[in-house]
Amino acid sequence: MLFPLIRHSSLRLTPVLARLPVTPNQITAVSLMFGLACAWLIMLEGWATVGGVMLVLCYVLDNCDGEIATLKNQRTEFGGHFDTFVDWIVHAAFFAALGIGVAETTGNTQWLWLGWIAAAGGAVNYLLGFILDGRDGASDAGDGPRRPEGFKDWVVYTFREMFRADFCFIVLVMAVFDLTWLLLPAGAIGAQAYWLLRLVHGAGDYHV
């Protein structure tokens, strides 16, 4: 399967990491450091491409932690919550930092607000997922992710899972062409659509 692209990288790195004395939570922590490094670099003029590379590394490790947990039979409830928390922090920091950087470069505070709106949308999605997963017992379902069936399912799956899974590559390409500022209006709108789609029945059942 071609998509998500990030899986092609993580599936090659995971066997290497599996031979090392590292735990899934340690890999998640390193992923967090790469994600925060991306946020810091994205604020600095001229460092966006390096920041994009940091985000790709963050995403690769974010996939490796779950794969390692499965291989080593080390899946835990805490690990799942930690992974979700790190995902939220990285994306919130990314959009907030991008807004700060573009606002400082242009002198226009509207970019700052777009960054904060996108970050706030990510926070709503995190809290909503935490509440809904706890209510539905999604983490204990044990049936695994289901495949989309109808048109509505595919729309939700593509937007919530496929775009999210390969978002790092979108950032990297935009950074190479100095177009990361376009992610601010897209993120400010998309982050709200993302958590609204979380309310669609069965949206939380899809995973890539």
Which residue ranges define each predicted feature?
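A feature for the membrane-embedded catalytic helix bundles of lipid/isoprenoid biosynthetic enzymes
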Residues: 1-14, 81-208
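Membrane interface segments of multi-pass transport proteins and intramembrane proteases
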Residues: 15-22
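Transmembrane helix-loop junction
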Residues: 19, 70-71, 100-104
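Proteins with a high burden of low-complexity, intrinsically disordered sequence enriched in S/T/G/P/A and R
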Residues: 22, 43-46, 139-144
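Membrane-embedded alpha-helical segments that form the functional core of polytopic membrane enzymes
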Residues: 24-78, 95
